[in-house]
A protein has these predicted regions:
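Charged catalytic and DNA/RNA-contacting regions of genome-maintenance
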Residues: 1-334, 343, 350, 354-363, ...
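ATPase nucleotide-binding head domains, primarily ABC-like/P-loop NTPase cores
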Residues: 36-37, 234, 303, 312-314, ...
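Active-site phosphate-binding and catalytic loops of NTP-dependent enzymes
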Residues: 88, 112-119, 255, 392-401, ...
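Charged, surface-exposed helical/loop "interaction arms" that form contiguous linear patches used
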Residues: 364, 368, 378-381, 400, ...
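Terminal-proximal interaction/regulatory segments of ATP-powered molecular machines
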Residues: 480, 843-871
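Extended, charged coiled-coil "arm/hinge" scaffolds of SMC/Rad50-like chromosome-maintenance ATPases
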Residues: 507, 511-545
Length: 871
């Protein structure tokens, strides 16, 4: 390395070489500086001024800086754009000679965020890893802000080849769509399937080597075998979990203690919902990305951050275990039938902070004084939460048998007592300022503070005392960082300075002095400030260390509070929406009476919603539903799926009664708007989704099929739709419960020879030429589509409506034969009046600039134009 390069430049280059793929924030005093290409990126992405800094040998390097106190705001913008940011800090004290030692203390990536201000409040911030090998996959995910760590293995779809998996592995896409990870890491020698969501980070393949990953897991958990985690023989799960731990060690090592457990889960524990179904049913967000209008938007009545994350998971993962479903229902039912305890519980939960993330910030060493204040206030409210679940405040005679279906939790009284005695009521935001520790907690700290206070008081009284003693009215006591405290006397009275004053500085208009006694008190004050800061930092860390010992109890309490919040929230939603408890059972039936769409009903704002039954009778497998657009077919289909899903997540449902046979998967084929931009036609997208359904549905699945075959010609569409219905009906391992909405009236003939098919239609009434949609599903096929009426409601121009009616009349007369439209009626219909070019010319004329002769010439041309048209 050249001797001409400055020491700071040398240090920077050495550190940057270790983190070449990151944007390096290099601490220099009160700023984080970026250099070279990093500076150009920071300037562009953060709207920073791009300057330069000398680097030796007459050269300068691009430079852009961020104030250290504002780093969180800038960091958020960089992470949101997918950058990995290495934070390099000054370590220890500056040596007498040379520069500060510096090191990278963490690398912040989209999946390794711990800053409260950067984390999504109502959802998890997952980091995921993927391994693919020989038709199988391993997925691990972790949220370092909550300590959640889980892993699974996925089987390939039946009939898939390893080559095809790298192009389209549906189960991976479905699981990652559920998780919505902020970042995904994978071996850099792997080709990922298309459509994987989130920021993607390729990592060296050797990091995922089986032996290395197993050793990483054994070392992290301090065990000699992974059998206790259920990972024996699951090499892909081990590689995914071990790889993600190594990534966290490289980026945010302080987060490793947060990961105290690893949960192996199977997709067979939960209802399968592929990406298309989650999107079509708008479970957690609408097609526009909004919460309002989604199922979660209706059900999420939670009042704590932990509860909001938890209810999102419940909506995203309906259960397949009957006992767990019924236990959740029992909790919801208690709060539905006990409205006063529900209200008291929700009031007690509302002030709570995010205990789960607060605990993990303490464990990671990122906690600040106000985090402990938030924890103290949360723990203070726990007795109220416990009391509200007993019903005694509401005058209930019975005590809630919490051990049966409600989570129980510790009041954490020891932790609360420690926080109450140690942390000040209103501490500073950061540990860089004093005032963190409550007076009386530490005799040592109190003594230093008292001595400092006495010294400050002496210095504060020095000016009036010396003025009176010396008689010098211009005498002042001041302070600066160069000389410390000093006595200043104007030049006119400097000759009267006492002999014990020691001259320190001469100014144009004044002399400055010090005294030995003043310097002693100055030393007491200045040393005391640093001493107080050191003692408070040590005590704060000791308090955090004690809380770390209680981390498991605190986290268990946080998760119990989250579950209580969700149960009471579902009860609140049930009360607001007049939901009932469904009967979930192991058979294959579906009987919903007076079912309603939970979202559409809420959007009606008090208007009457027309309920419908969804009852599959003995031997019935497929309902073919015909009827006009805008009549409610799609709403009917979706409400069947949503009611089933709500029942299996443990919620009450919008109906007067409901018996739900356990459904293993819900599939939907509704629309193709999201994939057209990827280069696939609407019809191709439709056929791919139908193929996926037919390959993976089982006899316990629920299929929602809307307008199969509409993306091609009528004959092709009818043929494909017909064949799909036959396949579902006749396949010995399929015959799934199916709701099939269609405009192809020919499909109603299937009920004549397929015993499991039934026809239904949407009731319509006509009066005085007007059509009224009754939104009621009734037996039988529809006799007309009423499409022209829908077009009229949509506001098409009257000439189009009239012309469509004429053509419809001709088509109906043809009785299915080739139609010859009357030439006279086939003339082009003018939808809008044609604009006369002379009018356009008149509008453009500038009358103020025309001469009389020019105006006469224009009139002559117009006259000739009209005369020519008459000929």
């Amino acid at each position: 390395m050249s001797d001409d390069v400055t020491p700071i430049r040398q240090q920077y280059l050495e550190i940057k070489r270790q983190y070449p793929d990151t944007l390096l924030l290099f601490r220099l005093g009160d700023f984080y500086e970026t250099f070279d290409q990093d500076a150009e990126i920071a300037s562009r992405e953060l709207d920073l001024v791009l300057t330069s800094r000398p680097i030796g040998n007459g050269l300068r390097a691009p430079l852009a800086g961020i104030p250290y106190h504002a780093i969180e705001n800038y960091l958020a913008r960089l992470i949101d754009k997918g950058y990995h940011v290495a934070i390099c800090e000054q370590i220890g004290d500056q040596p007498a000679k040379g520069i500060f030692p510096r090191k990278v203390v963490r690398v912040v990536t989209p999946g390794t965020i711990l800053e409260a201000g950067l984390l999504p409040v109502n959802s998890n911030n997952y980091l995921a890893s993927i391994i693919l090998q020989e038709g199988r996959a391993g997925i691990a995910y972790v949220d370092i802000s909550t300590g959640e760590f889980a892993v699974t293995e996925l089987d390939a779809p039946a009939g898939s080849s390893p080559a095809s998996l790298n192009q389209d592995f549906g189960p991976i896409r479905a699981e990652l769509t559920r998780l919505r990870p902020a970042e995904i890491i994978y071996p850099d020698n792997l080709v990922l399937p298309d459509g994987i969501p989130g920021h993607i980070t390729a990592w060296p393949a050797w990091r995922f080597e089986p032996g290395k990953c197993q050793e990483t897991l054994l070392s992290h958990f301090g065990v000699s075998s992974l059998e206790g985690f259920g990972l024996q023989g699951k090499s892909l799960a081990i590689r995914a979990a071990g790889g993600i731990l190594q990534y966290i060690k490289e980026t945010e090592e302080a987060a490793l203690p947060l990961l105290s457990g690893l949960r192996l889960y199977s997709l067979s524990e939960f209802m399968t919902l592929d990406a298309a179904t989650r999107r079509n049913l708008e479970l957690t967000e609408t097609l526009r990305g909004e919460l309002r209008g989604s199922l979660l938007g209706v059900l999420d009545q939670t009042v704590t951050p932990m509860g909001k994350r938890n209810i999102r998971q419940w909506v995203s993962q309906p259960l397949l275990e009957l006992d767990r479903i019924r236990k959740r229902q029992d909790g919801v039912e208690y709060f539905v039938s006990h409205s006063m305890p529900r209200a008291e519980l929700r009031a007690a939960l509302k002030p709570l902070s995010d205990l789960e993330r607060l605990t993990n910030r303490i464990l990671s060493g990122h906690a600040q004084p106000r985090d402990l204040v938030a924890m103290r206030e949360t723990l203070t409210n726990l007795p109220k939460v416990q009391q509200s679940t007993k019903g005694s405040q509401a005058g209930e005679e019975e005590l809630l048998p919490t051990s049966t279906f409600l989570p129980i939790f510790d009041s954490c009284s020891d932790e609360l007592n420690m926080l109450q005695s140690s942390i000040d009521d209103d501490p500073p935001a950061t540990l860089q300022n004093t005032g963190v520790i409550r007076p009386g907690f530490s005799p040592e700290l109190d003594g230093v503070i008292q001595a400092s206070s006495h010294a400050r008081e002496w210095i504060n009284n020095l000016e009036p005392a010396e003025r009176q003693r010396t008689g010098i009215k211009t005498l002042k006591v001041g302070y600066n960082k160069v000389f410390g405290y000093y006595i200043e006397i104007s030049q006119g009275q400097a000759a009267n300075a006492p002999s014990e004053y020691i001259r320190k500085q001469t100014l144009v208009n004044a002399e400055r002095y010090i005294t030995p006694e003043m310097k002693e008190y100055e030393t007491l004050v200045l040393n005391a400030e640093e001493r107080i800061r050191e003692i408070e930092l040590r005590l704060f860390r000791e308090v955090c260390s004690e809380l770390m010992k209680s981390a498991r109890r605190l986290l268990d309490t946080a998760r119990a509070l989250a579950e209580l919040d969700v149960l009471s929230a579902l009860a609140e939603a049930a009360a607001l929406g007049s939901f009932i408890r469904p009967m979930v059972c192991e058979d294959n039936g579906l009987d919903i009476r007076d079912g309603r769409h939970p979202v559409v009903e809420q959007m009606l704002h008090g208007e009457r919603y027309v309920p419908n039954d969804i009852t599959f009778e003995e031997g019935e497998a497929i309902r073919i539903i015909t009827g006009p657009n805008m009549s409610g077919k799609s709403t009917y289909l979706r409400q069947a799926a949503l009611i089933t899903l709500m029942a299996q997540m443990g919620s009450f449902v919008p109906a007067t009664s409901a018996t739900i046979g356990m459904v293993d998967r819900i599939f939907t084929r509704i629309g193709a708007q999201d994939e057209i931009h990827a280069g696939q036609s609407t019809f191709m997208v439709e056929m791919i989704e139908v193929a996926n359904i037919l390959h993976h549905a089982t006899s316990r699945s629920l299929l929602i099929l809307d307008e199969i075959g509409r993306g091609t010609s009528t004959y092709d569409g009818v043929s494909i739709a017909w064949a799909v219905v036959e396949y579902i009906h006749n396949h010995p391992q399929l015959r799934a419960k199916t709701l099939f909405a269609t405009h192809y009236h020919e499909l109603t003939q299937l009920a004549d020879f397929l015993p499991g098919v039934r026809n239904y239609n949407v009731a319509v009434t006509e009066a005085d030429g007007n059509v009224v949609f009754l939104h009621k599903i009734i037996p039988g096929g529809a006799d007309r589509s009423y499409g022209i009426h829908v077009a009229q409601l949509a506001g098409l121009p009257r000439p189009v409506i009239q012309r469509a009616a004429e053509i419809m009349s001709e088509l109906e007369k043809s009785s299915g034969q080739a139609v010859r439209i009357n030439p006279q009626s086939a003339q082009q219909v003018a939808l809008f009046p044609e604009t006369n070019p002379l009018i356009d010319e008149l509008e453009k004329l500038d009358m103020n600039s025309l001469s009389p002769i020019e105006a006469l010439n224009i009139l002559f041309e117009w006259q000739r134009h009209f005369l020519d048209k008459k000929k």
